[in-house]
């Protein structure tokens, strides 16, 4: 008998970082960061790698799809962002990070844009987006853009994680937003959501399911949790359900994608220093998917992806051996 052992995704010699998923016609495009741990987390610069899957059991690996820049360019590292599709093709809005810029006291996190016809090969825009850190916001924490089309207002909405001021101890984390008619010229609209509960928010996302809008985010804290809020309106007010987390501690940086039939949450489970459970978490680890479902009261739940669970069971069951049962 055969048994499937694929309950997660982690290429050999690689630790998976933030994932920027996109779904289309039963297939998921899993754009993700690959950390080599050489010599440690964030040691070697990375771009976005790509793997596609229809069942979360078998993956097709394309290697680095959105390639990192040089050590002199703003996207020495390609941090998180989002991917979506228009009639003209695929768009990626992402955060470029350069550690040399940080050392020199320059803005180290820059919002950038790339396009693709097939979602595999990307062409970067020549200039940075005119979405710089605004006055009064921390210039070192301005990242993880997410873009969606607002049908009611007939414009694009971009949200990203930010922090008011530069004191990392204060709970001034918030989401800010910009709007655009053409994906080129963006207008700053101020704070989108500023609940005063964390020092920073990462990997924000908005989607609609039924009559509800959902706002997903990761708390920038030792909790390492993915939370959500809900509202009947795109701009809130956002309410917190009693159980607002998709999983427990150490399931982080999750974004969802819809392939036309189901919505799946893409997050990662971190490793620990020296692989010792007593030690602190490291950035990056193993990708684990959860299928998202909506309950009758409008709250959300998650469950294992069906095909992955089927794979974990014996494909050719045999009677139990009384000696081993």
Q: Which positions does each model-derived feature cover?
A:
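Blade-loop segments of beta-propeller domains
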Residues: 50, 56, 60-86
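Beta-propeller blade signature
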Residues: 49-53, 110-118, 174-181, 227-233, ...
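Repeated scaffold domains used in trafficking and secretory/extracellular systems
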Residues: 202, 252-254
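Hydrophobic core segments of beta-strands in well-ordered, beta-rich domains
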Residues: 17-41, 62-63, 79-104, 111-113, ...
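Beta-rich accessory regions
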Residues: 233, 240, 247-249, 258-262, ...
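Conserved small/polar residues in nucleotide/adenosyl-binding loops
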Residues: 1-7, 314-320
């Amino acid at each position: 008998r055969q048994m499937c052992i694929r309950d997660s995704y982690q290429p050999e010699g690689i630790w998976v970082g933030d994932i920027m998923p996109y779904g289309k016609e039963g297939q998921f495009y899993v754009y993700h960061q690959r950390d080599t741990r050489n010599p440690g987390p964030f040691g070697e610069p990375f771009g976005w790698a790509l793997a596609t899957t229809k069942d979360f059991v078998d993956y097709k690996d394309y290697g680095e799809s959105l390639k990192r820049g040089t050590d002199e360019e703003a996207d020495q590292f390609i941090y998180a962002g989002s991917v979506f599709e228009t009639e003209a093709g695929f768009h990626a809005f992402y955060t470029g990070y350069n550690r040399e810029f940080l050392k020199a006291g320059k803005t180290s996190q820059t919002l950038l844009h790339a396009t693709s016809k097939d979602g595999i090969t990307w062409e970067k825009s020549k200039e940075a987006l005119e979405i710089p850190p605004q006055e009064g916001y921390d210039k070192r924490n301005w990242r993880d853009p997410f873009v969606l089309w607002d049908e009611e207002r007939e414009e694009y909405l971009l949200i990203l994680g930010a922090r008011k001021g530069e004191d990392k101890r204060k709970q001034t984390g918030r989401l800010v937003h910009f709007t655009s008619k053409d994906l080129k010229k963006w207008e700053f609209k101020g704070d989108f959501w500023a609940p005063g509960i964390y020092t920073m928010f990462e990997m924000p996302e908005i989607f609609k399911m039924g009559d509800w809008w959902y706002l997903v985010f990761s708390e920038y804290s030792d909790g390492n949790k993915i939370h959500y809020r809900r509202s009947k309106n795109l701009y809130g007010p956002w309410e917190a359900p009693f159980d607002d987390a998709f999983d427990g501690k150490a399931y982080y940086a999750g974004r969802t994608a819809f392939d036309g039939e189901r919505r799946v949450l893409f997050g990662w489970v971190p490793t620990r220093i020296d692989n010792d459970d007593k030690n602190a978490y490291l950035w990056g680890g193993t990708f684990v998917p959860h299928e998202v479902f909506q309950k009758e009261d409008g709250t959300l739940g998650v469950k294992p992806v069906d095909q992955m669970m089927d794979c974990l069971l014996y494909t050719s069951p045999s009677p139990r051996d009384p000696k081993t049962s």
